[in-house]
Amino acid sequence: MDNFIFETKLKWIPYDKFRSVEYLDKGGFGTIYKAIWFHNNRDNEVVLKLHNNLSENLDEFLNEWKYHESCLSSFDIIYFYGFTKDPDTLKYMVVMDHANKGNLRGNLARVIKSDWKQKLCMLFEIISGLYDIHKQELVHCDFHDGNVLNHNNDNENRDKIYISDLGLCKPVKSFLKKYDIYGVIPFMAPEVLRGNSYTPASDIYSFSMIMWEFTSGIPPFNNRAHDIQLSLSICEGERPEIIENTPQCYVELMKKCWDVTSLKRPSSKEVLDIIEKWISPYNNVKDINEELKYNIMEFINAPIGHNNNLVTGSHSQAYYTSRLLDFTSKQLNEILESRDLQAHYSSQFTSGKVNEILESEDLQANVKVNEMPVSEDLDDCLI
């Protein structure tokens, strides 16, 4: 730990430098506390994360952070100060900036009441942070609405959006067995559920679910049990229902981002460029091409709000914190492969049966023709 802190910009902060430490929340990675840290001649609100398994797997965590340190200068990544140690448990804790408006999931009811320009600006900040991660050849690996944070200083008109928990999932996943799955099901790409590695494209899939939340005001699949059945449905192409009155250009981008084939999804840079075009000329529509003008007018004319027919109450087995799932990717793949095999045989059987029927009908027709009595009097055939 000492060598790591010496080599990086991170700090070792003695625990007695914190005051007013209080429990804040429990997340997928561990327990979260809020505290006041007197630093640079002023009080700073910070978060202390008591990370599950961090002390037992410190080397893995530090190695991961050597790579992720390059993202700390991004204005869209929550700032990571360093480490401390709980004197009672002797466990290491991560010290990070505190976002005073909570996470995106807790702000969805407010987001849905925003106009499209505000929504697009928020999405632009989120995808900018994701792009900052990807251009360093890194992957978030646990991107969901609980890791998108809102902060607002008293003098700001709107919230600043940050991405958090970058690099915190690797130490947890090092404890998993070969076929274990860890995460939040609705935000996990099909290929990840099936046991493949995380890639930038799997982060983009997660971003598509956040895009959908901006149209619905609720988390994806909140009315379903987050179990193997939902995972199977996601792998077979099921996605959240498109919300009425969503601008078509937005729907098309969202669908590209959640494509079942990872190679068909756009990169974070491509998504960033598209959203930037939607935002930049918002107040000067006359000076842009017809297609972009049409798209922007869609956003301007779209009603604010969401479909009142959506179920806003969550299912009792809907879980939106990262967790070890109670089924494995091996089980998931076995069921999917079995279904594919059944569908193949069913298709073969159906086409074969159709051919048999057609051949049978042709045969019967020939028999009937051959059995018809032929008149010996040709006059019988004349009209």
Model-found features: residue ranges?
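Conserved catalytic-loop aspartate of Hanks-type protein kinases
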Residues: 203
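Conserved short submotifs of the Hanks-type protein kinase catalytic core
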Residues: 89-103
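A conserved short helix/loop substructure at the end of the activation segment
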Residues: 241, 258-270
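Short beta-strand micro-motifs within the conserved protein kinase catalytic domain, predominantly
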Residues: 79-92
